[in-house]
């Protein structure tokens, strides 16, 4: 490990400790975030501050979520739908969230609306040796050919939970999604119990919009 790698490892450890101090204490999630090198998922300009608790632009009007948000959503999923299992991510973006899910032991499928981001992240996953299945498409419609899923995580905001995603949940599966208006959404978890869905409401966040047939136009 060279000096740069050691420096990044220290920054990663400090990021994890900061998340713990903010109340995110699931050790499996924190361990995954300690292992996955976030600086590889941002551009060179942002890499020096990759372990600060901030979101960064990744192009095409999209962002890599701040570490707190990643840890928060991952904890909601993990505590209700522990690995191993089949998880669908909506909004591949930088690929960081999918890599965290992969590190936890899930079989990860991810849908990205923007072809350029998809192509970039597929190359990154290949270089990192990550076996994550990706496709370009309307994330609000899910990935019907691979359904059902044990878990679904939506990393963009929707005005309501897309019916297509609910239909692609397996029994006892859970879906984590920010739902609300353009400027503010409430993190919401749906769990499938037979033919009905139970709903839990959590903290408020601000995400980029989910664009698609069952999202924002």
Curated annotation (Swiss-Prot):
Major place of residence: cytoplasm
Active site: 65
InterPro entries: PCMT, SAM-dependent_MTases_sf
E.C. number(s) listed in UniProt: 2.1.1.77
This protein's record includes keyword S-adenosyl-L-methionine: yes
Keywords: Cytoplasm, Methyltransferase, S-adenosyl-L-methionine, Transferase
Biological-process GO terms, alphabetical: methylation; protein modification process; protein repair
Cellular compartment(s): Cytoplasm
Catalytic activity: [protein]-L-isoaspartate + S-adenosyl-L-methionine = [protein]-L-isoaspartate alpha-methyl ester + S-adenosyl-L-homocysteine
UniProt cross-references to Pfam families, sorted A to Z: PCMT
Purpose of the protein: Catalyzes the methyl esterification of L-isoaspartyl residues in peptides and proteins that result from spontaneous decomposition of normal L-aspartyl and L-asparaginyl residues. It plays a role in the repair and/or degradation of damaged proteins.
Protein name: Protein-L-isoaspartate O-methyltransferase
Lineage: Bacteria, Pseudomonadati, Chlorobiota, Chlorobiia, Chlorobiales
Gene for this chain: pcm
